[in-house]
Structures are given as structure tokens and as C-alpha cells.
Swiss-Prot record:
Enzyme class at the top of the EC tree: transferase
Family: Belongs to the radical SAM superfamily. Biotin synthase family.
Keywords associated with the record: 2Fe-2S, 4Fe-4S, Biotin biosynthesis, Iron, Iron-sulfur, Metal-binding, S-adenosyl-L-methionine, Transferase
The protein, known as: Biotin synthase
Ligand binding ([4Fe-4S] cluster): C57, C61, C64
Pfam families hit by this protein: BATS (PF06968), Radical_SAM (PF04055)
Cofactor: [4Fe-4S] cluster; [2Fe-2S] cluster
Domain Radical SAM core: 42-268
Organism: Rhizobium rhizogenes (strain K84 / ATCC BAA-868) (Agrobacterium radiobacter)
Molecular function as annotated in GO: 2 iron, 2 sulfur cluster binding; 4 iron, 4 sulfur cluster binding; biotin synthase activity; iron ion binding
Catalytic activity from the UniProt record: (4R,5S)-dethiobiotin + (sulfur carrier)-SH + 2 reduced [2Fe-2S]-[ferredoxin] + 2 S-adenosyl-L-methionine = (sulfur carrier)-H + biotin + 2 5'-deoxyadenosine + 2 L-methionine + 2 oxidized [2Fe-2S]-[ferredoxin]
SUPFAM superfamilies: Radical SAM enzymes
Known role: Catalyzes the conversion of dethiobiotin (DTB) to biotin by the insertion of a sulfur atom into dethiobiotin via a radical-based mechanism.
Length: 327
């Protein structure tokens, strides 16, 4: 069960379960030590996330209010935004302190044509601002990944969501292998991977470890690993799931840090349910990025004012944490 900061790709699920279940202070202590080996503990990257096309997705993800299958969800569908508006919002996010701008479209897969051309222009515009650019567009083909890479895309987000074993209880319109194939396509064109999952959907601890096992077996590890806690939304199949206890998120962050020491661990959806102290504990446990802004796609997030108070409480953190690829 050694977790000494060495980059490994041979973790066993049982090893990861054992790490996750360590006494909390031991787990967080180990994770913080490993974090300091690979990262400046005073650097926390702020990322902003915008829904550039909202609702009407043909996938049936049980957690997602944007699925067309969940007709009782109160959600206004919006067509793809125009590039000028998106780049203007990126500039606003940059002025508020964000270094990374993430754009999400509720699609099953990328289609060639006017809309994809518009996304390419968005990526170019965000990069011209000196920001990292990330998109999540669903599945994509090699020639599309090539175009995104040529436009300067920093990272492509495509989450595994959960373990292979639990996956079929959450989504049936896309296979786990579909997700892995998309990740392989992205990486083959030199685009960074942003890939993580969601906890609190009814999965077991072993499911959580199994998902981390899949990620940690990738060579190299995903450059970015978002850890999300389910935000139950009325009208979705998971609407009645209880909100997870904050320390479950702390444990997941710490375990992710131990098995993927050099990756950026992003504290993502569900952060609005954490008090200031729980968020700080997540940062101590190895999270080194937060999503900044009032909403994450269509779910609530901690407000910018709250985050300003959070960082003030911590002290003078260096939040100017932009990768060299964004220069």
C-alpha cells in the first residue's frame, strides 16, 4: 500500500480501497505530503465553466438535468452560443481571476459543420486571451480532435463518471468503452486529458476505487482529474439521493492525490454544499484547482464573493497557476 509520491500505473483496486479507508488524519497527512512533492501547496488554479449549448442531450445520464430523457426537469434549452459572446464571457472570467476557461456543450458527439466550426473559433478566442481552453463536447472522431489540437485546445474533458461495474446503473446510451476510446483519440493528438467522475450516486467505496484504478492505469495519468459530488436535481432519476457527507469528498480527493501524484485534482461540482472549512480540508488533502463562478453548467456553485472570502481566510495563495501551454 505504498504511496510515496512515485508515479505508478500498477495500482490494484484493493490497494486503493485500503488507502481510501485509512484513518482520516493519516490519509490526509499522506496525501498532503505527496502533494507537496509534486506541487506548490500555495498554488490553486481557478477555472471557469460555461454551458455553451444547454439541454436536449440524447444521452440518459441519470444525474444530468440536460438529458432529453428527463422531461420533468425545469431547464431552459439554449442553442449553441456565438463565439463572440463566449470569448467575451471568457474575458470577464479572466478579469475575475480565472486562468482556465472550460466550455461544455450538451451533445452526444461532435458533428462536423457550422456548430463545430464555431467551437473552433471559441477555442482560438479563449487562447488569444492567454487562458487555458478546455471543452467537453461528447464523443469525437480523430479528424475533429486534430482540428481542436490545431486550434490550440489545452484539454478535453470526458469523464468516466463512475466504475465500469456501476456504470450501467447510471447510463445506458453510451458504453464505458466509448468513453475510453474518446480519451485515447484525444490523447493521440497531444491534447491534455481532463477526466474524473462523480461520487454520491449510490456507488460503493470499491466503485470509487475502481474508477480511480482505471484513471491511474493510464500512461500518462490524466493531466486533470475533476472530483465531483452529485448535486441532486429535481426531475432526474437521482433527485432523491442524499447529499454526501463532506468528509467523503475529502477522502476521494486525498485518494486521487495519492494514486495520481502529479495530476491536477479539481474540486468540482458539489463544492457549494461544503462549508469553508471542508473546502480548505480538500485543498490540504491535495486539491489544487477549483471551479470559479456562480454555476457549473446548470448546477449551483460557490459564488465569486464566497470564494474571495475563502482565499482570504487561507491567506495569500498564489492563484496565478497557468500551465506553460497557455502562454
Amino acid at each position: 500500500m505504498a504511496a510515496d509520491g512515485t508515479i505508478r500505473h500498477d495500482w490494484a483496486i484493493d490497494e486503493i480501497v485500503a488507502l481510501h479507508n485509512l484513518p482520516l488524519l493519516e490519509l490526509v497527512g499522506r496525501a498532503n505530503a505527496v502533494h507537496r512533492m509534486h506541487h506548490d501547496p500555495n498554488k490553486v488554479q481557478k477555472a471557469s465553466l460555461l454551458s455553451i449549448k444547454t439541454g436536449g442531450c440524447p444521452e440518459n445520464c441519470a444525474y444530468c438535468p440536460q438529458s432529453a430523457h428527463h422531461r420533468e426537469v425545469d431547464l431552459t434549452r439554449d442553442r449553441l452560443m456565438d463565439p463572440e459572446s463566449v470569448v467575451a464571457m471568457a474575458a470577464t472570467a479572466r478579469a475575475a481571476g480565472a486562468e482556465r476557461f472550460c466550455m461544455g456543450a450538451a451533445w452526444r458527439q461532435v458533428r462536423d459543420g457550422r456548430e463545430f466550426d464555431a467551437v473552433i473559433e471559441m477555442v482560438k478566442g479563449v487562447r488569444a486571451l492567454g487562458m487555458e481552453a478546455c471543452v467537453t463536447l461528447g464523443m469525437l472522431k480523430p479528424h475533429q480532435a486534430e482540428r481542436l489540437a490545431a486550434a490550440g485546445l489545452t484539454a478535453y474533458n470526458h469523464n468516466l463518471d463512475t466504475s465500469p461495474e456501476f456504470y450501467g446503473q447510471i447510463i445506458t446510451t453510451r458504453t464505458y468503452q466509448d468513453r475510453l476510446d474518446t480519451l485515447a483519440t484525444v490523447r493521440s493528438f497531444g491534447i491534455d486529458l481532463c477526466c474524473g467522475g462523480i461520487i454520491g450516486m449510490g456507488e460503493t467505496i470499491r466503485d470509487r476505487a475502481s474508477m480511480l484504478h482505471i484513471l491511474a492505469a493510464m500512461e500518462p495519468h490524466p493531466e486533470s482529474v475533476p472530483i465531483n459530488a452529485l448535486v441532486p436535481v429535481e426531475g432526474t432519476p437521482l433527485a432523491k439521493r442524499p447529499v454526501i457527507a463532506p468528509l467523503e469528498l475529502v477522502r476521494m480527493v486525498a485518494t486521487a492525490r495519492l494514486v495520481m501524484p502529479a495530476s491536477t485534482v479539481r474540486l468540482s461540482a458539489g463544492r457549494s454544499n461544503l462549508n469553508r472549512e471542508a473546502q480548505i480540508l480538500c485543498l490540504v488533502a491535495g486539491a489544487n484547482s477549483v471551479f470559479y463562478g456562480d454555476t457549473l453548467l446548470t448546477t449551483p456553485n460557490a459564488g465569486i464573493g464566497e470564494d474571495a472570502e475563502l482565499f482570504a481566510a487561507i491567506g495569500e495563495l498564489d492563484c496565478d497557476h497557468v500551465s506553460a501551454s497557455a502562454a
